[in-house]
Amino acid sequence: MTTALHEERLAAVLAAVAETGARNVLDLGCGAGDLVLRLAERPDIERITGIEIDAARLRLAEARLKDLPEAACARVQLACASLTQAHPVLAGYDCACLVEVIEHLPPADINRLERAVFATMRPAHVIVTTPNAEYNPVLGVPAHRMRHPGHQFEWDRPRFARWAGGVAARTGYAVACRDICGAHPDLGGASQMALFSRSGR
């Protein structure tokens, strides 16, 4: 079961995927398959690959796929692998999604993730979402805590924009950041999204 906030986040990601016109999509850090299942329900998406390092969560995703029609399942592949290691076999996708993933990585792994995704896989588009730390008071999160015990960090919007801009400049992508999951006039949304598009496609 997903929360209303997570459903809103997934809807924003699906809308962004539609913006790109992607026909094949990578879900990097797919977890139990929340996004994969929703992508599989869309006939315009021809191929979906989910990557997850947690074998138990991947098994759950596999089990959930069995509830889909056979034609939808046939368009999905799942694999257990690290997101911070380069996988040339995953090159050539139209779009890669990292939904609330980067905040679970130790800071030292962020650069490895950048190299793996933006230098090796180099999808035409990359969609990244992460919590907006500025919004935490609205959710009742104390100032000295993060939203989830597994989070290594939570960035405010300026920090996220700096990271996204740096990645784009280093790897030949353009990027646009936006608020998602709410629009507080001062604090933005509960989550934030960066949509990267490879330059010179």
Briefly describe each language-model feature range.
Residues 32-44:
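Conserved SAM-binding loop of SAM-dependent methyltransferases across substrates and taxa
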Residues 22-31:
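Conserved class I S-adenosyl-L-methionine
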Residues 23, 46, 124:
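Short acidic/polar active-site loop segments enriched in Thr and Asp
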Residues 3-6, 12, 34-35, 53-98, ...:
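S-adenosyl-L-methionine-dependent methyltransferase catalytic module, highlighting the catalytic core
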Residues 5-23:
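Conserved alpha-helix/loop element of class I SAM-dependent methyltransferases that forms part
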Residues 47-52:
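Conserved SAM-binding motif I beta-strand of class I
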